Swiss-Prot record:
It comes from the Bacteria. This is DNA-directed RNA polymerase subunit omega. The lineage of its organism: Bacteria, Bacillati, Bacillota, Bacilli, Lactobacillales. The keyword Nucleotidyltransferase applies. Disulfide bonds: none annotated. Its EC number is 2.7.7.6. Keywords: DNA-directed RNA polymerase, Nucleotidyltransferase, Transcription, Transferase. The RNAP catalytic core consists of 2 alpha, 1 beta, 1 beta' and 1 omega subunit. When a sigma factor is associated with the core the holoenzyme is formed, which can initiate transcription.
């Protein structure tokens, strides 16, 4: 018998189709290095995703458009942080060149 059982999982999501999609997306996230929300009994990412769904740590976002907006905002923040870091590195290089020319 599968652990967690399909019956307990279907209490957490509206349909078995939603369960499959949520489980697959979470398994891909875990394989891509996303931080886990708990300790697992399972080794496989697909079963780990089901464990997280069963515990209630992973849920379907109630408003898909808000989820997309939050993902876009996170990606934009990461892009801006990367640009700022690159700008600081370029400034540091320019400063070191100036200091080297003064000597």
């Amino acid at each position: 018998m599968l652990k967690p059982s399909i019956d307990t999982l279907l209490d957490k999501v509206p349909s078995k189709y939603s369960l499959v999609i949520l489980q697959a997306k979470r398994a891909h996230e875990l394989e891509a290095g996303e931080k886990a929300t708990q300790d697992f009994k399972s080794v496989k990412s697909t079963l780990r995703a089901l464990e997280e769904i069963e515990s209630g740590n992973v849920v379907i976002h109630p408003d898909p458009s808000a989820k997309r907006a939050s993902v876009r905002a996170r990606i934009e923040a990461e892009r801006l942080a990367k640009e700022e870091e690159e700008r600081k590195i370029k400034e540091q290089i320019a400063k070191e060149k100036e200091d080297g020319e003064k000597i």
